[in-house]
Amino acid sequence: MKTGERSPFLTIMLVMGLAFLYIPMILLVIYSFNNSRLVAVWGGWSTRWYVELFKSPEVWDAVILSLQVAVVNATFATVLGTLAGLAMVRFGQFKGRTLFGGMLAAPLVMPEVITGLSLLMLFITLKGIIGWPEERGATTITIAHITFSLAYVAVVIQSRLTGMGQTLEEAALDLGARPFRVLMDITLPRLAPGMVAGWLLAFTLSLDDLVIASFVTGPGSNTLPILIYSRIRTGLRPDINALATIIILAVAIGVAIAGIIMLRQQKQRERELAMAD
């Protein structure tokens, strides 16, 4: 095979992989417009399940709770994960660094069942000792999500910091700038794309979580994945397809917006570097 030629085998494998990933989603979107109550029987095009979905207060409560938890989790996880990443990359060798790195990476490899169970035991113990939390719900879910999301954000930040280098920071320090000023004016702006990526990753992980949330939630505090799972257990329903389609659309829009923002930031940095040269 000549250099630059496409391998038919690789092309076929790529097409098969994309088909395996996206055909189920396409079928889900199509059947969300099915007029029949039977999911597998086509009854014509209709938007009735979207109308019924938007009339359901249970769905709206789950959507609002999931979004609230995801936004708060992503924000706190980004702040804490950024600080942890800075500590691991920019602070050099310090006492306890290996232990800190191991503890930071633990949520990445810990089974979700174990994480959920351990957090449940923590909240039960705290309630017995100090009386908090009075009941499990949005607060406990948010805390649980932050504990594992910040580890993912820290990995993203560490990767970004490693690729950035420290030339500009060192030059600013040599010229008399204070470390805090260097952090705010040089490091964080250059780190912004990584922070945005970490925020989006934490947001997505929170919206997608079922296992951990099911351990630490209480009656009346159902997130969207818990609601979907509870409804599927009683049988697959067309309104679930409609709900899943809306989620897919929202995620696609979010990814597109984030991609546009990051692309603009990248072009702006390239223009600044070109002007500096």
Language model features: what each stretch is:
Residues 103-141, 152, 193-196:
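Generic hydrophobic transmembrane alpha-helix motif, especially the helices
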Residues 1-27, 100:
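N-terminal signal-anchor/first transmembrane alpha helix
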Residues 23-57, 122, 217-219:
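Short membrane-interfacial helix/loop motifs at transmembrane-helix boundaries
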Residues 1-5, 72-104, 124, 259-263:
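Transmembrane-helix boundary motif in ABC transporter permease subunits
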Residues 2-12, 92-96, 158-173, 179-186, ...:
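C-terminal transmembrane helix and the adjacent membrane-cytosol boundary/short C-terminal tail
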Residues 37-72, 93, 230-237:
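Periplasmic/extracellular loop-to-transmembrane helix junction in inner-membrane transport proteins
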Residues 2-7, 50-59, 207-261, 277:
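Interhelical loop and adjacent transmembrane-helix boundary motif
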Residues 13, 18-25, 153-158, 164-165, ...:
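Transmembrane alpha-helices
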